[in-house]
């Protein structure tokens, strides 16, 4: 029985379907499979603190094995000395002794451990294997258990020599690719039964060390302690050169190499060097093309596990990084950090023309094109040039229709799965995002966030002119009113627009494309927003309510116009005489009194008038004459 904290946890280690015989097979190799071993090259790179941590982890491992009454195999003397597992024990004890204080010895017996003497070759072992002392019969020595000297195990492919057979086996696995232990639940394979057991524990959400704050479970106490620091904020490892602190020693070591320039891991293919092993492994996969991490939902594979975790959020909808200023949430940290720069404007890469800051050089380059007008991405099919690569990719899908995510209903293709899911809901009518204030539902989360600001009145994106906006895209579009920039031009008529959305809507006037049809009256519209607005005529829905007098409106523009009655605000001012108006069309009509422009002509008498309302009044004079 495996007991942690008074609770029987035997079920964590093996699936229920496995037989007692299979359990015995796992138990018989338990120590060697859970032992953490380093090659000689890796061990030389470890510092005193890391070696001390290694000792703590191994002690804890053996205490756990001691709890389940682990015994060591008793084979004949010849087999013992040929057995690579015995060499591994000797190897680890040697490493374990190195990590102890100078005044400690391997023969020291820790308190509370009862050694049990084996009948074979006078070997003495405590059940807590690394906490005990070991003696070997002088006539029977394992494979040169010493730090220097002969290295009898040489790998044929890479030429690396090893003191210990287990180190040789560890090196051999990447070449042979041999993985012997399969998880019956997910099919993943492992090179040792110990790794399989740990995988099963993690998969079942188990582990003896459970965080009281978030409930996450861990197999190793060292990992548990590291995790706890994410809650406490403790950073015990401080760089002596720049005072930057880290919660994990390995992160501290990686950082130190930024000062020393040390890069001990060199790629055999291209000689590129890396400061840490994980970066080296990730780089190697760019040569081999290996993508071991596969998404269970769509089959897409990734070279690193973190990329898989981020990708899986596109299926689950999980967005753990939320902006406290505007409420927008993100799948991964990088996007969140880039978003925050939009609020602060203090990115490290500054535009020399307008002073705006960006998080990376590529974002700055894209922005600079709005000043220079440069459009380096040209479509070979239609000749259209675009300033951003993402816009170019989206444009190419219009020609090819072969985006990775294709709608089965209308055939439209999309690059991003989240955008594709939002589009699918235009066909199904599904609206999973509901407002807690008024119960209104939306197809995409961004629409819900925009709607919620109508309740809170929050407008987090502020222009230098004082005007504020609900979302970043509206803010961007507004900025072009100051610069006068209209980078999106219609190829048909030459009309230019400040944003791509306006251009797309305009294009449909040439194409006569109206894909969105009203189910009630069959009237068709060029874009989805117009259809939704039109449907309110049939439903009588009036979602926009005045907070002053409770009058409701079908459209936001009507509400905004109405609110000016209460506020007396006149946003539209004539630049020639200073007269202000509540609506833009009133301003346009007024401006014609200065220019003398008369666009509206009476068909009866040919008289031209400056406004449509004036024309209607004039027409009545003809009607009176006929009466």
UniProtKB/Swiss-Prot annotation:
In terms of InterPro entries, this protein maps to: KRAB, KRAB_dom_sf, Znf_C2H2_sf, Znf_C2H2_type
Where are the C2H2-type Zn fingers located? 181-203, 209-231, 237-259, 265-287, 293-315, 321-343, 349-371, 377-399, 405-427, 433-455, 461-482, 488-510, 516-538, 544-566, 572-594, 600-622
Note the PROSITE patterns from the entry: KRAB, ZINC_FINGER_C2H2_1, ZINC_FINGER_C2H2_2
Q: Name one GO cellular component term.
A: nucleus
User: Localized where?
Assistant: Nucleus
| UniProt KW keywords | DNA-binding, Metal-binding, Nucleus, Repeat, Transcription, Transcription regulation, Zinc, Zinc-finger
User: What does the protein in this record do?
Assistant: May be involved in transcriptional regulation.
Q: Which family does it belong to?
A: Belongs to the krueppel C2H2-type zinc-finger protein family.
Q: Could you identify this protein by its name?
A: Zinc finger protein 442
């Amino acid at each position: 029985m495996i007991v942690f904290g008074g609770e029987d946890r035997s079920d964590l280690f093996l699936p229920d379907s496995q037989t007692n015989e299979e359990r015995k097979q796992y138990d018989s190799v338990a120590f060697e499979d859970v032992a953490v071993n380093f090659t000689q090259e890796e061990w030389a790179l470890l510092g005193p603190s890391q070696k001390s941590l290694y000792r703590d982890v191994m002690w804890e491992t053996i205490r756990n094995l001691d709890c389940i009454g682990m015994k060591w195999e008793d084979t004949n003397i010849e087999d013992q000395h040929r057995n690579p597992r015995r060499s591994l024990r000797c190897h680890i004890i040697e490493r374990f002794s190195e990590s102890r204080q100078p005044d400690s010895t391997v023969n020291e017996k820790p308190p509370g451990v009862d050694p049990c003497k084996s009948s074979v070759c006078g070997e003495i072992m405590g059940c807590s294997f690394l906490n005990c002392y070991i003696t070997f019969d002088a006539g029977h020595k394992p494979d040169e258990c010493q730090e220097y000297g002969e290295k009898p195990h040489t790998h044929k492919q890479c030429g690396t020599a090893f003191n210990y057979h287990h180190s040789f086996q560890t090196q051999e696995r990447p070449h042979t690719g041999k993985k012997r232990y399969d998880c019956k639940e997910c099919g993943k394979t492992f090179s040792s039964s110990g790794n399989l057991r740990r995988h099963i524990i993690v998969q079942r959400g188990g582990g003896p060390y459970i965080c009281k704050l978030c409930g996450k479970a861990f197999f190793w106490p060292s990992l548990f302690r590291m995790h706890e620091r994410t809650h406490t904020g403790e950073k015990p490892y401080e760089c002596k050169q720049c005072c930057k602190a880290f919660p994990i020693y390995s992160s501290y070591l990686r950082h130190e190499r930024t000062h020393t320039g040390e890069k001990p891991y060199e790629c055999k293919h291209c000689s590129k060097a890396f400061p840490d092993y994980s970066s080296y492994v990730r780089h190697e996969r760019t040569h081999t093309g290996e993508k071991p991490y596969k998404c269970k939902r769509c089959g897409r594979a990734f070279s690193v596990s973190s990329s898989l975790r981020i990708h899986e959020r596109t299926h689950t909808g999980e967005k753990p990084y939320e902006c406290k200023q505007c409420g927008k949430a993100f799948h991964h940290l990088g996007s969140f950090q880039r978003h925050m720069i939009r609020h602060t404007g203090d990115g490290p890469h500054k535009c020399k023309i307008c002073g705006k800051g960006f998080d990376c050089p590529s974002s700055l380059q894209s922005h600079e094109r709005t000043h220079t007008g440069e459009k380096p991405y040209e479509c070979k099919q239609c000749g259209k040039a675009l300033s951003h690569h993402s816009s170019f990719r989206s444009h190419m899908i219009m020609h090819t229709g072969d985006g990775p995510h294709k709608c089965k209903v209308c055939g439209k293709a999309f690059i991003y799965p989240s955008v594709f899911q939002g589009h699918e809901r235009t066909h199904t009518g599904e609206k999973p995002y509901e407002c807690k204030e008024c119960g209104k539902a939306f197809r995409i989360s961004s629409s819900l966030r925009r709607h919620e600001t109508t309740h809170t009145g929050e407008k987090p994106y502020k222009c230098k002119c004082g005007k504020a906006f609900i979302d970043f895209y509206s803010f961007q579009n507004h900025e072009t009113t100051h610069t006068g920039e209209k980078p999106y031009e219609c190829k048909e008529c030459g009309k230019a627009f400040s944003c791509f959305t306006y251009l797309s809507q305009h294009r449909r006037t040439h194409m006569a494309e109206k894909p969105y049809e009203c189910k009630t009256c069959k009237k068709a519209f060029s874009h989805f927003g117009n259809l939704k607005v039109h449907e309110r005529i049939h439903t009588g829905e009036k979602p926009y309510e005045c907070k002053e007098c409770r009058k409701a409106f079908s459209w936001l523009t009507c509400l905004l116009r109405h609110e000016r009655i209460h506020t007396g605000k006149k946003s539209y001012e004539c630049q020639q005489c200073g007269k202000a108006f509540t609506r833009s069309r009133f301003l346009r009509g007024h401006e014609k009194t200065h220019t003398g422009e008369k666009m509206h002509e009476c068909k009866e008498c040919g008289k031209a008038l400056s406004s449509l309302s004036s024309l209607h009044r004039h027409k009545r004079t003809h009607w009176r004459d006929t009466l």
